[in-house]
């Protein structure tokens, strides 16, 4: 019997307070980036803002207000804009993958071509003072905006960015696959086995029901889009 005890569907959940730092274009918000194997959903719980997205189909702006649910698939370059106290509960497909590196910032091409340069520009040391973490988070946001605006102005470069992002994360794929097997795949396989049992008239798995709860493992962590309250991931 497949064992799975995580959140429904293998998703990850976090609570996000979007950065209100102004950028060079006069907008306040987070760091543009994409995910390569995970869809992401926003459940807006407070404030107002928008998410700018860039895909092969073009550029869009989706307004965000309390009650809005917005989501996008892998390959979507996204930038959150804060227009006043924007707070979001984030649902991420394949819980654990983004924490394991399934996120590439839209840095200028020379950083994407050099894994060491990319890591140096994007890593926030966990043991650094809060002021230093904030400085690094803001600096990498501004650097990513340089690459993002270049893609906005010349969207034909998006395919090259996709290729560079895929090359950057390729060494991590085996680790991602292991996390996916423990999480989302295990959740789906458990459902399949439950359906097989029910089709045979076997309700035995219902006696194995459990209840779980957790509190955030970190509060106010500096993320790509803002400060995060996060939960343990597999």
Task: Give the location of each predicted region.
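Conserved short histidine dyad/triad with adjacent acidic residue
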Residues: 15-35
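His/acidic/aromatic-lined binding-pocket segments of jelly-roll/cupin-type domains
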Residues: 32-34, 39-44, 61-62, 70, ...
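Short, conserved beta-strand element in jelly-roll/cupin
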Residues: 36-51, 91-93
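Short acidic-glycine-tyrosine-enriched beta hairpin
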Residues: 54-75
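Double-stranded beta-helix
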Residues: 85-158
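An accessory alpha-helical subdomain
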Residues: 125-203
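Charge-dense, extended regions
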Residues: 207-234
């Amino acid at each position: 019997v497949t064992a799975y005890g995580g959140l429904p569907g293998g998703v990850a959940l976090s609570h996000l307070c979007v950065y209100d730092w102004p950028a060079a274009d006069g907008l306040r918000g987070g760091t543009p980036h994409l995910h390569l194997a995970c869809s992401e959903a926003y459940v807006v719980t407070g404030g107002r803002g928008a998410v700018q997205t860039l895909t092969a189909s073009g550029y869009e702006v989706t307004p965000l207000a309390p009650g809005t649910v917005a989501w996008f698939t892998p390959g979507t370059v996204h930038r959150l804009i804060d227009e006043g106290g924007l707070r979001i509960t984030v649902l991420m497909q394949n819980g654990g993958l983004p924490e394991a590196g399934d996120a590439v910032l839209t840095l200028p091409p020379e950083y994407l071509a050099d894994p060491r340069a990319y890591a140096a520009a994007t890593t926030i040391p966990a043991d650094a003072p809060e002021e230093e973490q904030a400085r690094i988070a803001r600096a990498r946001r501004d650097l990513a905006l340089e690459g993002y605006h270049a893609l906005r102005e010349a969207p034909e470069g998006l395919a090259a960015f996709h290729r560079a992002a895929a090359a950057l994360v390729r060494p991590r794929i085996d680790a991602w696959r292991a996390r996916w097997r423990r999480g989302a795949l295990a959740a789906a396989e458990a459902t399949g086995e439950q359906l097989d049992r029910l089709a045979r008239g076997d309700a035995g798995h219902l006696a194995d029901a459990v209840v779980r709860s957790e509190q955030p493992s970190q509060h106010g962590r500096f993320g790509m889009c803002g400060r995060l309250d996060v939960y343990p991931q597999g």
